[in-house]
Amino acid sequence: MVLLVPFDGSDLSRTALERATEFATYRNEDVLALTVIPNEPEYALERGWVDANDPFDIEAIADRMAEQVEAVAPEASFRYEVPEDVSSMASITTDVVRTVRQVANEVDASIVFVGSENAGRVSTPVSSVGSPVSEDPQYDVHIVRHA
């Protein structure tokens, strides 16, 4: 079994990775940090993965995320995925959530550690990944709300 951490480099995702690493010692499980990188330059720009004048390079973004994961949790594994564009009607957030859920299922995640200020609240911003990921009954969810 695996502890899965969707990781975007934010303070909350870093804290979620730290918590998963601490928890892994108690459960004797591996930690997998997952970065989902949509093939959308604006998404990368909004998250601070690239600057406005930088070329959009998925491999370079993945390398930077892997370095950040290594700095926070050297014992964690890192993986990145580029979500499939299944439907032109789906939002980028929907694609990211679907990818996180697919990977969680694939690696048989026992717990997903999500860094989210608003997961589980009554109203959820459209761009929130935390709430939809937390709705899947196949795994437990640890929500980190404070970095």
What do these predicted regions represent?
Residues A16, Y43-R47, M89-T94, T124-P125:
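Short, well-ordered secondary-structure micro-motifs
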Residues A73-V112, A119-G120, Y139:
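Structural beta-alpha unit
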Residues S110-A147:
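Gly/Ser-rich helix-loop-strand patches that form or flank binding pockets
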Residues E67, R101, S131:
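Active-site phosphate/pyrophosphate- and oxyanion-stabilizing loops and adjacent acidic/basic residues
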Residues I37-R64, V86:
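Acidic, proline/glycine-rich short linear motifs
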Residues V2-R47:
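Small/aliphatic-rich secondary-structure junction motif
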